Amino acid sequence: MAEYGQTARHVAPAELVATGKFTVPYAVNLTLSNTGGLFSNDLYKVKDTNGDVVFKVKAAFFSSRHLLLDAKGTPLLTMKPKVRRRRGTRRVFRGESTSPNDLLFSVRKSKMFQRKDNFDVVLATSTDEAAPCDFKIIVGSKEYTIYIGETDHEIIAQMNRKTECCARDRLEITVNQNVDFAFIVSLIVILEEIKPSRRSAM
């Protein structure tokens, strides 16, 4: 498990997913597209500004799990609903594991009763579920904004939604420097998967 510093600027370390591989000293622009088909477990593809594939997201057959893979198909993260907890909660594990020892972070709705669907991200190092969140996601009509901590003072990533032909959405993601962009992509995928049932399921 990665070690996390005490200051807000060190809460999103290079080692959250893979040692420094997905963290760079400059802002990163990515595009996430839905690639899901009726008989396919392919859900999303993430490309960089050169059009090269950076990540893929697949659904595990006969399971509620989703896998974030690198361009070579290596599993990086497993995203899974949290059983017997309030609806909308997701837990994210290292690789293909779902062991508590490999838990990296959880995503949950900020409050049970709120006008906007905002979400909290809590790192696995926070054992108290009532503790303040490590990151907050503010959801707009066509954008997500991700902040460090409880306040909205320090943005680490943003997503803007563009609608293309055949009603498919293209999500344009900007990740600030020194922020793990595999981590950011996993958060956006989780919100996209929660979205269809957000009003009725939470």
Regions found by a protein language model. Name each.
Residues 78:
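Solvent-exposed, positively charged interaction surfaces of folded domains
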Residues 2-65, 71-74, 87, 98-202:
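Low-complexity or membrane-interfacial segments used for flexible interactions
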